[in-house]
């Protein structure tokens, strides 16, 4: 078949692809590019390969035909077997080795599980030992009803030791009996008020009765009785000591209350 017969190229020639060739491969150049070098190396020139001189030997009748399997090579395909052969390259140095990571992860998992199991076993063992040992119960002491009970004295006479110098004599006023007030005809014990002071339980400046009426302004409380401070009570003691009063008896404060309700600022003469 002649070259210009049907305006078709011979089937023995390879037309370069329109796509950009891969960097790792080199395809057979077109026959029209006469300045290109042959595909094979110059050492293998004795082999039969396509060159412009071999194709156009003399004329249209000297066209050489070769089998397609010999002239055109198979389409290249990507092989992933070469990835593991370039371990020292700069590109693959940053790629982590997946197989080694998976193996290390598989080895670490059973170790963590064993540690957890050991800790759980220790807890169970410790708990079992604690639970197995019975607690020793303390024996309750039985009360003997025949033994006499010692009652604590809660007498109002038991007070702190408060020493005061009265007319040159040291006196412990904490040991004195509780003063009383006989304004109602019956002596009633007074209440402690402040530090060493006393308060009446049966009289005010207007009322004299026992018990005192309930305070209307404060629920659950009664009207406050007359008051006497520690300083005023000390003056009462000085007066009674000068009169030769026996302090073993309770002091009657009926005549010693102040007219305005308190002896805090009253001077007794």
Curated annotation (Swiss-Prot):
Listed Pfam families = GAGA_bind
Species of origin reads: Arabidopsis thaliana (Mouse-ear cress)
Q: Where in the cell is it found?
A: Nucleus
Q: Which domain of life is it from?
A: Eukaryota
User: What keywords does the record list, in alphabetical order?
Assistant: DNA-binding, Nucleus, Transcription, Transcription regulation
Function description: Transcriptional regulator that specifically binds to GA-rich elements (GAGA-repeats) present in regulatory sequences of genes involved in developmental processes.
- Tell me which stretches of the chain form a coiled coil: none
Q: What is its main location?
A: nucleus
Q: Name one GO cellular component term.
A: nucleus
Tissue specificity, in the record's words, reads: Expressed in seedlings, leaves and pistils. Detected in the base of flowers and tips of carpels, in petal vasculature, in anthers, in young rosette, in the lateral and primary roots, and in the gynobasal portion of the ovule.
UniProt cross-references to InterPro entries, sorted A to Z: GAGA-bd_tscrpt_act
MF-aspect GO terms: DNA binding
Name this protein carries in UniProt: Protein BASIC PENTACYSTEINE3
Similarity comment:
Belongs to the BBR/BPC family.
């Amino acid at each position: 078949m002649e070259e210009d017969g049907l305006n078709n190229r011979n089937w023995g020639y390879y037309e370069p692809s329109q796509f950009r060739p891969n960097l790792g491969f080199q395809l057979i150049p077109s026959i029209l590019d006469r300045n290109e070098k042959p595909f094979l190396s110059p050492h293998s020139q004795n082999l039969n390969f396509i060159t412009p001189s071999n194709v156009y030997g003399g004329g249209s009748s000297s066209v050489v035909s070769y089998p397609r399997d010999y002239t055109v090579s198979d389409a290249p395909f990507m092989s992933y077997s070469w990835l593991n052969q370039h371990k020292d390259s700069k590109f693959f140095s940053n790629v982590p080795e997946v197989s080694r990571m998976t193996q290390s992860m598989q080895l670490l998992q059973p170790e963590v599980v064993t540690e957890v199991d050991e800790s759980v076993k220790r807890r169970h063992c410790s708990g079992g030992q604690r639970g197995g040992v019975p607690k020793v119960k303390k024996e309750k002491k039985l009360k003997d009803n025949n033994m006499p009970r010692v009652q604590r004295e809660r007498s109002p006479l038991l007070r702190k030791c408060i020493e005061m110098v009265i007319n040159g004599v040291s006196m412990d006023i904490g040991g004195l009996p509780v003063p009383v007030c006989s304004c109602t005809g019956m002596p009633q014990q007074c209440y402690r008020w402040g530090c060493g002071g006393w308060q009446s339980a049966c009289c005010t400046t207007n009322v004299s009765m026992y018990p005192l009426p309930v305070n209307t302004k404060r629920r659950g409380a009664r009207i406050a009785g007359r008051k006497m401070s520690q300083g005023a009570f000390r003056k009462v003691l000085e007066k009674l000591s000068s009169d030769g009063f026996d302090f073993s008896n309770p002091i009657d404060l009926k005549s010693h209350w102040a007219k305005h309700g308190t002896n805090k600022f009253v001077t007794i003469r």
